[in-house]
Structure formats: structure tokens, C-alpha cells
């Protein structure tokens, strides 16, 4: 730099093209049924409150919105429904689909430990499991008898769409966007979604 023109303490921003000769491809890893609790606080920023039209998921590259639950009470957390299970044969995996032998209900597993939390496929009004069911995991093949079924918070998944955060030239933070015709939630939210975790590297191939 020229001290006469810029002075000795000047800060200069240089914009230019570089050639990187050693680059590594990033790897995506599927992460299923990640949970995000959304509650109102005194200093919450936009995108972090249940009543915001857009709610940030806090990470990029989400690819499926599994479920959104509304506690309908600002003082209590939203919850998924749960199954208390009898003897389990095999090992269930998080995010896999389970099917009820009697009811025909289908759901995604959020937590594999009993009581097993889950999200019904089909959203509000979908057929739920019963105590007559033996559930079977689609990918694991694990089975278990259902001892009891506990209802979760109100399902409001249909009130939102998923913005994956993927843009033409960068990955933005993913978010859920409330539909213009949908009413604002009344309580705290629980959002369940699938996303891709990114490894270290320079680009996606």
C-alpha cells in the first residue's frame, strides 16, 4: 500500500480470484427426525418465536418437515405422541417407519426408547395405533407389542411449508414458513424434521 495516499494505519479490502490446487468434496450424512423446541422469551429474535411467520431451524439443508406440534399453552412444551412397549425383538432405528399390525397406522420414530415417541404419517386425523397392535420397523425389522398409547400435542404440520435453505449459489438456513391462511400457534412448538449434516470440505459434488 501507499502510505502517502492511504496512511500507515489504513485497512484495505482486496477482492480477487484465487486458484486452490488441493480441494476436498463435502459429504452429506442423513440425520432423521431432529427435534427443535420453540418457545417465547422476553428477548427472542424474529424467527425464534412460535408466532413468527418464519421459524428458523438453525441449520442448513433440511429436506423434509416431519411434524409440527402446538402445546396450546405458553407455559408448557409441546410433545409428540408416545407408545409404551412390551418386549422388543430387534433394534428400532430413529427415523424409520413403523406399522401397526391391527390398526394399519404408520408413523416415523422420533425416539426409540420406551415410551417410544413418534409422528403419525398423514398428519392431523391420521389413524393412530391401538393396544391391539404389534409394531414392525420397516428398515430394522424390529417388532414390539403396544401396551399403551399416549396422545401428544395438537398437530399443526399442515399450517407450514418447509424452506430448505438451498439456493442457486449457497446454502441458507432452513426454516418453516406459516401459510397465509393458517392461524398463529397458541402455545410452544415442537418441530420434527430431516436434514443433511455436512462434513468438512470445499464443495459438493
Where are these predicted regions, by residue range?
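Signature of Asx- and small-polar-rich beta-strand/turn repeats characteristic
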Residues: 1-87, 91-96, 101, 105-128, ...
Amino acid at each position: 500500500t501507499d502510505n502517502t495516499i492511504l496512511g500507515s494505519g489504513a485497512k484495505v479490502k482486496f477482492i480477487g480470484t484465487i486458484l486452490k490446487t488441493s480441494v476436498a468434496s463435502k459429504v452429506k450424512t442423513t440425520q432423521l427426525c431432529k427435534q427443535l423446541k420453540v418457545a417465547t422469551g422476553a428477548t427472542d429474535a424474529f424467527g425464534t418465536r412460535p408466532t413468527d411467520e418464519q421459524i428458523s431451524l438453525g441449520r442448513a439443508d433440511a429436506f423434509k418437515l416431519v411434524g409440527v406440534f402446538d402445546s396450546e399453552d405458553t407455559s408448557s412444551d409441546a410433545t409428540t405422541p408416545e407408545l409404551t412397549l412390551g418386549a422388543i425383538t430387534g433394534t428400532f432405528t430413529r427415523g424409520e417407519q413403523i406399522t401397526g399390525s391391527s390398526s394399519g397406522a404408520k408413523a416415523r420414530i422420533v425416539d426409540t426408547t420406551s415410551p417410544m415417541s413418534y409422528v403419525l404419517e398423514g398428519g392431523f386425523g391420521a389413524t393412530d395405533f391401538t393396544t391391539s397392535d404389534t409394531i414392525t420397523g420397516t428398515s430394522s425389522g424390529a417388532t414390539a407389542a403396544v401396551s399403551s398409547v399416549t396422545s401428544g400435542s395438537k398437530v399443526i404440520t399442515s399450517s407450514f411449508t418447509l424452506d430448505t435453505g438451498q439456493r442457486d449459489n449457497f446454502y441458507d438456513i432452513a426454516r418453516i414458513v406459516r401459510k397465509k391462511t393458517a392461524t398463529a400457534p397458541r402455545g410452544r412448538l415442537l418441530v420434527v424434521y430431516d436434514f443433511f449434516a455436512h462434513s468438512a470440505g470445499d464443495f459438493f459434488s
